[in-house]
Amino acid sequence: MSKPIVMERGVKYRDADKMALIPVKNVITERDALLRKPEWMKIKLPADSTRIQGIKAAMRKNGLHSVCEEASCPNLAECFNHGTATFMILGAICTRRCPFCDVAHGRPVAPDAEEPQKLAQTIADMALRYVVITSVDRDDLRDGGAQHFADCITAIRAKSPEIKIETLVPDFRGRMDRALEILNATPPDVFNHNLENVPRIYRQVRPGADYNWSLKLLERFKEAHPEIPTKSGLMVGLGETNAEIIEVMRDLRRHGVTMLTLGQYLQPSRHHLPVQRYVSPEEFDEMKAEALAMGFTHAACGPFVRSSYHADLQAKGMEVK
């Protein structure tokens, strides 16, 4: 029997070390290993990387993190080259260990009390008009990190009064009442929380999370702020069916969610959950049509769509795919 990993505070555990800590083991079959990316999944890198390096330098200067880098997002080059990034607060170590995600797992250090001001200054220096703030899960904090979100929102608005802020929040497991009390006092312009996938395979995809809890979080925020758009997204290609995706979309509408994102799951490493299928652009178009027919005010559905992909355009109701 192998010895359990003793996690040191502040150390990032990735790939095999991270997956070894997950109770539900995922076996990669020969078919999974041979599944190749179709033509529509090939990415063109920009010829000039000057702006990409500039954003990375600004992040490093202030000790900030982007989910684009930490989660190995396939759109990093495109977004950075257009001068946009999704900031990840509360450190770069997550207390969860979801097998689809490339963010490191471990025992995080205490939140940086200066991060809200550093973040606000960086955003002001970049002259951003729309910003997405997300975080790792912080199950070690009594409020799940909600107060830190609120502090960041307050600091950003103080330096950039005209900016629009979207928050992509964790589920605040076991701390919903306290978290919503804080966030209701300092609400963002868009409230986003991702369901990620369908209930049937939740235990494999999101160990430690609960489908109905996440729906309730979205619903309760919407009840408190009916004027603020609520948003959620799924990764597809993890073993779900299109019919199951449609049913999740119905659940989201029943809980007041008005904006939707659907994108193709990509395996960060051979240690993560394998891709079970590649969903075609035509299928994404069909699901978008279904979403709009259900009453979503905006639906971004396509192979490379991620929750914060061109989030400013999504908020304006413009086409994103």
UniProtKB/Swiss-Prot annotation:
Xref: Gene3D superfamilies: Aldolase class I
Keywords of the record: 4Fe-4S, Cytoplasm, Iron, Iron-sulfur, Metal-binding, S-adenosyl-L-methionine, Transferase
A Pfam match: Radical_SAM
Subcellular location: Cytoplasm
Cofactor: [4Fe-4S] cluster
PANTHER family on file: LIPOYL SYNTHASE, LIPOYL SYNTHASE, MITOCHONDRIAL
Name assigned to this protein: Lipoyl synthase
